[in-house]
Amino acid sequence: MKFVTLYESLLEAVTTEYDTLHVLKQSPRGAVSVVRHKKSGTRYVFRRYSGSGEVYRRLLPVLCPHLPQIMEAAEQDGQTAVLEEYVQGDTLAELLMGARLTEREARQVTIQLCQALHVLHSMGAVHRDVKPENVILRGSDAVLIDFDAARIYKDTSESDTQVLGTTGFAAPEQYGIFQSDERADIFSLGVLLNIVLTGKHPSREMAAGKMGRIVRKCTMTAPEQRYQSARALMEVL
């Protein structure tokens, strides 16, 4: 009898039990598609990419309104496959094409993203790609998605093994200076907060008043000068 791995079983299930509706993203690292279960009609997101799936596996038992539910996650020979909840809604990036958020709305979104990051950071994970394209607004809930660039913080590492993230949002340490930790996500969240308020990167125009002071502290070059945790940032918002 041939032994079937969890990874192979997941690929087989997606191939035979689901219809692919459309591709959301494709890159040299892999692809992300929306699939529909043939029997139930329920839609899911299916990811397959080169890289570690450890963060997705740690998220399997987690239920948080600001993170997608991970249904299955498997890894084999450096390849990861993930089946996750399909979050219905527009991305924050799409919303910002037509309008800015009010300060109250921006604060609410940022607090919810802090809650999502607190969950990730509590399990030792760093998202490393917090940006408007990776935030879906589902009703009144902001949902942080896409953990393909995420990694687990390791005490023994001096720097990140891969340079991942988005230029303009990635913290300086993500470019190999030293290992990124939860404060890298604080940096990215500060950039996001400024953009939803002003439409511009903080290097071009800083938000006014208290929110501007918060953005400035989030985006300090030295990690030790930023808010040290998502909870600390949440407390000042």
For each predicted feature, which ranges?
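Conserved activation segment of eukaryotic-like protein kinases, specifically the C-terminal portion
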Residues: 159-173
